[in-house]
Every structure is written in C-alpha cells, then in structure tokens.
C-alpha cells in the first residue's frame, strides 16, 4: 500500500495592510478554494472595523471560516484554534475544494501546520495551588507579571484574566525550566499537510504609509463608535480588547489620552505589529516571499501554488 496522501493547503501570510484579503479571494476563485481566517482577532463578533474583517461584499461568494465565531467577552486559545481549523481543512478537502489559510497570527498558523501538542497533563499540583492562592490574594495582574518575567512571549499572548492559562505557563517553566513558547517551538517537526506557504511583503515605508492610511479609513468607517459599543456593554479586561485598534481607543474612553493621541498610538502600534509579524514569519517559518510593492503579482503566485501543490487552476483549464 502507498503512503496516505496528505491534504493540500495553501497559506497566505504577511503583515497587516499588505493586501492579503483581496489576493486570497482571487486565488480562491482561481483554485476552487475556500478561505480559513488565520487571524486571532477576526473570530470576535461585532469587532469588524478594528480587525479589518473581510466584508460580505469582499468575500464575493467565497466561503470564509473562523470569522465571527466568538463573542468579545469569550476567551480563545491556540489549542481551540488548532482543533477548529484542522476540522475545517478536513471538511473543505472532502468537498473537493482547496483550503486557503489567510492571516497574520504566526503562532496560530504554525500550530495548525505542525504537530503541536497542547496538553494539560502532568505538572506540579502544589506549585499550581500556590499560584492560584497568589492570584486570589494579590490579584491576577501580579501572577501575570511573574509570567512576564520568565516567559514574555507567552505573557504577551495570554491575557492576565485567563488565570488558568497564565498559571499553566508558569507551571511549565517551574517544572521544566523551559518557556511554554520554547516548548512549542521544540515540537516543530514535519508539516502535517502538503503546504504551499506564501508570504507577501513590500517596501517598508510604503507598508507603513498603507497602515497609517488604513487607520484613518477605519476612523472614517466608525471605529470610534464600534469601540464605544463594546465599552458601553461593560466589556473590560477581555482577551479581545487587547487587540490593536481597541486597547488604544479604550484609553481614550477612560480619559487616559486624547482622541488624537489614541489614533497616533494606534498607528504606532500597528506599524510595530507589522514589523513583529515579518520578523516572526522570517524566523519561524519556511516561507516563499513575494514582494508586492509594485502590484499584487496574482498570476506569479498562482503559478507557484499550482506547481507546489500540483493543481490546475480555473484560469489554466
């Protein structure tokens, strides 16, 4: 018997505002594909403008998954993302379509493509109970700060109010001497799928100009009102509100900064995030990069995916 054929998956990654959305939809049309969002914040309902969520009009009939699946007050983990996306990949493949993952949250996408294990097994019960007691007595921020000291990568990813996951990350460091983020990286081995991993990049100054313009457009589209709606619903200290585009405007509503300062900070944070995204993808993943400074290079990228995954597009039939 021959070996089991792995499912084919196309992945489009790149920094915020580089042009992933339009390209992915054009590719889905050409390759008989369906799109899975690889963005950890587009999962939240009513958080549309600040997450640059794809609109119904932009979808143009192409099915999209992992969008609008949680309420803003809900927590969401990498493990749940991994489980849901792998299920979507199976189902899309069974329908004879090509799964196309699109996004910018590196760890989330990595967790799907590689054999990452997320377990709550073992550990140090006494240490865990000590941390739980500390969280009760001194507050969740105190315990989260302890995590920041030993594993800043995990602390950035896990909200302080998600006490169970904060303590789990501390427990892993306490029992193994390794960061949770390092453990996940060590698990990285063979890809689970037959993957075409495409990265979009462009001239940095042009990208930063696009990011600044995008923030201005978001404000014109009603980002302030969108965030105000969440604020008025009493949504505080949630994982969702840590998203860029929300935490800055929350500072305005809590009278910490002026609106002008909030928008300026949003632009700065968005540019920094784009830089971090590019660094992550270049350091952690084997990506074939396409510079889209002069245009989106649809035909070139399409030919690459066809060759890598041995597909025929609708354009070539």
Tell what function each PLM region has.
Residues 1-317:
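Phosphate/pyrophosphate-binding catalytic cores of soluble transferases and nucleic-acid-acting enzymes
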